[in-house]
From Swiss-Prot:
A single GO molecular function term of this UniProt record: bicarbonate transmembrane transporter activity
Gene3D superfamilies: STAS domain
Glycosylation sites: N201, N207
Subcellular location: Cell membrane; Apical cell membrane
The name this protein goes by in its record: Sulfate transporter
Post-translational modification: N-glycosylated.
Amino acid sequence: MSSESKEPHVLSPKDSFEGNDRYSPPSRIHLELEKKSSTDFKQFEASEPCRPYPRIHMEPQEKSNTNFKQFVIKKLQKSCQCSPTKAKNMIFGFLPVLQWLPKYDLKKNILGDVMSGLIVGILLVPQSIAYSLLAGQEPIYGLYTSFFASLIYFLLGTSRHISVGIFGVLCLMIGEVVDRELLKAGYDTVHIAPSLGMVSNGSTSLNQTSDRICDRSCYAIKVGSTVTFLAGIYQVAMGFFQVGFVSVYLSDALLSGFVTGASFTILTSQAKYLLGLSLPRSSGVGSLITTWIHIFRNIHKTNVCDLITSLLCLLVLLPTKELNEHFKSKLKAPIPTELVVVVAATLASHFGKLHEKYNTSIAGHIPTGFMPPKAPDWNLIPSVAVDAIAISIIGFAITVSLSEMFAKKHGYTVKANQEMYAIGFCNIIPSFFHCFTTSAALAKTLVKESTGCQSQLSGVMTALVLLLVLLVIAPLFYSLQKSVLGVITIVNLRGALRKFRDLPKMWRVSRMDTVIWFVTMLSSALISTELGLLIGVCFSMFCVILRTQKPKVSLLGLVEETEIFESMSAYKNLQARPGIKIFRFVAPLYYINKECFKSALYKKTLNPVLVKAAQKKAAKRKIKKQPVTLSGIQNEISVQLSHDPLELRTIVIDCSAIQFLDTAGIHTLKEVRRDYEAIGIQVLLAQCNPSVRDSLARGEYCKDEEENLLFYSVYEAMAFAEESQNQKGICIPNGL
């Protein structure tokens, strides 16, 4: 038959829609999916005679014999070499601004950078003040944090678009550590008693000159800056030792669930400000539930003025935020609603004398200028060292993921290692200037990108806006109610809380990811932020192990007129050769799933142990001359075969999906091969990757004369099996 007269062979899915046939070029292969898994072995006779298939021989590359000592010496020599070129590259690599700033296109980019920097700066002013409360700090420290982070990332960062500064989840984690250490030190956690003269519901002694006395606010920033310093050290160390792989264990589902769970805790911590209640911040396991219990127990003490102010701010902020998102493609810049609300609320509080008349909680005095730098408290390091680990991992994971996301979107590359250095120094250096932990923030990054940002020069503009506030405008926020700041914080949680909308889609795509999301979210919200992250990571790793412990297995069939093998449980019209079964195991073979591998292989083919036992039993009964049918054993091992099990002569194990073997995996393959050979069935391995081949060689799976049991393709293994059966005089009606 000529090639022109042949029709293309089409394998269509069993669950395909009938009557929807479309013409396909003859060169295309179409597989028809099975409706449900099946182990029926349908035989299709082939008209072509058996043709020889030559063995493939490949010579492996020679491996270098460099030992560990030589490797270390070589690396040290390479790292310790010094030359002007290498010194220049090192400096330019550490300070990326030296690379891109001389090439900066002023006419093309300056307008977008100035606009985006100004807008982000305007948004950061109220958010920095609001998030300071979340971190248990004075408003001035939030402004310091955003200012220094913007400048340092401008010098060290490789992303053109991300906005580095305060981030709600990190502020929450810092605040929990601060409250715990304040409680240990004997400070009152109900009233905020700043050392800079801020007005509070409680009375405290103020001290700005004596180093011997440190009030609550002073001690709070000591704790915050010490945690920040340690988190930065961890991040720089991870960059130096190139252990950024840690972020691999923080999947998108895990991070999303963690942020959503933490958002509930943030919302809960800010609810007292909306109601004007003076409550201690609950910490530890179940803090969210404890806080709500305290709120409802004290609900009768609600400050009506604060409540009305909160409702009015919500009525303004929520709709305008939604309008900003809905019309962001038409708006050249988002409406700075938060700043408008802050200004209006400050004026209303000042001229209405709300604090004097209704005892509302206000921000109080915010000083201008900068405080002298001060080192973190080294005595606190043992107490906060563990807390800083989780904070550092979350900070760099979010920063690196956002950097890579926006770099991919805009067609440039970022250096993940340099990003860890950048965010690390954004924490180390500001920790000496009374700042707390920072990272990239998605909401502000989206605003920055949508308003025309082209480079990190926009970060300088943001810093200039904050500098203006720090030097001139800050005292004007004296009468700003804390309830307004709480509303701003809660409104900015909308993005994280909207993740619930994505759950149906996530469930359809991956049920395992959805379960990880729920476990992480619930544990972060109901147990604690740090334990929630740990539980999420452990559960995520458990899910990975579970997937490899119960992997997918299938028997393969040949696609007609090709050398392609596919799962017979997934596709129709596949050829199964008599006497040969091809088994695929889709997972690494190691100690966790070795028993699953054996049981699945025995179920899909036959159990050699039971067959051997039946043969011995038959021999004792002296019925060797009669054929052994083993019909009872077939039922016992649940194998549905369309022919006598003992007609099976060869099992080919497709190793293409086996990424690696450990010692237990090699022993399992040896055991399986030995058991099958005991009943006259040969076992062949096909498509082993170089790593698996190397493991088999080191594990002495094959002797020198048995190297022919390893094949580079399944088709080659099948051809070898049929040839060996023909040589033994076994009738094979269908050749390859």
